[in-house]
Amino acid sequence: MKFLRNLFDDAKPSFSKGGVAEKYFPIFDIFENLFFLSRNRTKNPIHVRDALDIQRMMVIVWLATFPAMFFGMYNIGNQSLEYLALINTPNTGDWHHYLVNIFGYEPNRFINKIWFGAVYFIPIYATTFLVGISWEILFAIIRKHEINEGFFVSSVLFALSCPPDLPLWQAALGITFGIVIGKEIFGGTGKNFLNPALTGRAFLYFAYPSDISGDKVWISGLGDQMIIPQGYSGATPLGVAAESGVPGLTDKFSWFDAFAGNIPGSVGETSIIAISIAAIILLMTRIASYRIMLGTLLGMFVTSSLFNIIGSDTNPMFNVPFYWHLVIGSFAFGLVFMATEPVSGSGTNKGRWIYGIVIGVTVVLIRVVNPAFPEGMMLAILFANLLAPVIDHMVVMSNIKRRKALYNE
């Protein structure tokens, strides 16, 4: 490491102010911070010093996604190899086949499942990262500021929220929209009012709905095959619930399968166990707000319970209880990773409770009442992002009025 440190120290003058490569300093800076902690020192007389800086915070969040990421790759392989064996077609039908064939299509081998999932997920993640970091570098050079480590988190969250069969050009287009439109045009990290990863996914959801939703996109190789065996469905539990309610859910899936993650879905959203590990890490390090998490759970519980009480003979989603809402769709993934994003969420303590409740209520309303969107977590969080400044303003004004009233007494 001393050799690398000396190498960076020798090269730094060329990239610093007045150097021959001054305008490319953001590129140098991102590689330096990749290997070493920032060497910047506080220069202003008024400051707050904390061991948990932005770089370390983003690294922790990135590492917290690993349980969901690795289980997601396993689940892609598990679901897909089972399907390919069912139709007796040991070939995905596209370029992935040449890589998958290194270990083979035997569905009962653990390494085959992990490898199959990696063959589909890693190209999506790599595309997302490379395209996104290119935009970050471009804007950093134009604005002459350092590259923030927040993109490492945005890229992995975007990739984990995508189906495994997503075309790579769409992954590139989605992260481009999320970074450029969702963040950079507002000034970059810390100034965006929408979650960049969700903004990119929402763009794909409305621009290319057949590739981001439906029954075929959740299992790799399914879209390449012309034959679907009788009685087989790639539908997610949420899609089944929207069509046939709790009876359909329990007929095709057990609650524990949904909790463990042995179901079709986006790469990182299926396993509540893996997501819970991440939640514990983020809460223990105080990166995520427990107020937002509890508020979201409370809003979901109350709203779904009210719909259960009201009931409906025509809409089966009315009767789906809260414990099913928790384990199907992207509720848990959005709750832990997306809703707690500090920049686009509420900043006051009371505001975080309200913000979380708004998400919990809205996601159930979209799932139950709106037949066009069986999955509501993405739209619920983006809607709450828009309300976050208003919520914080109301909380601050309420505190001012309360203090004025006490002062006048």
Q: Which sequence ranges carry the predicted segments?
A:
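Long hydrophobic alpha-helical segments that form multi-pass transmembrane helix bundles
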Residues: 190-276
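Generic transmembrane alpha-helix motif of multi-pass integral membrane proteins
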Residues: 154-164, 181, 276-282, 333-339
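Loop-to-transmembrane alpha-helix initiation sites
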Residues: 172, 193-198, 322-330, 352, ...
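Central hydrophobic cores of alpha-helical transmembrane segments in multi-pass inner-membrane proteins
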Residues: 124-138, 175-183
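N-terminal signal-anchor module of multipass membrane proteins
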Residues: 1-121, 125
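Structural signature of hydrophobic alpha-helical transmembrane segments
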Residues: 114-128, 165-174, 261-272, 318-331
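Membrane-interface helix-loop-helix junctions at boundaries between adjacent transmembrane segments
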Residues: 146-227
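A beta-strand-loop signature enriched in Asp, Gly, Thr, and Trp
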Residues: 293-349
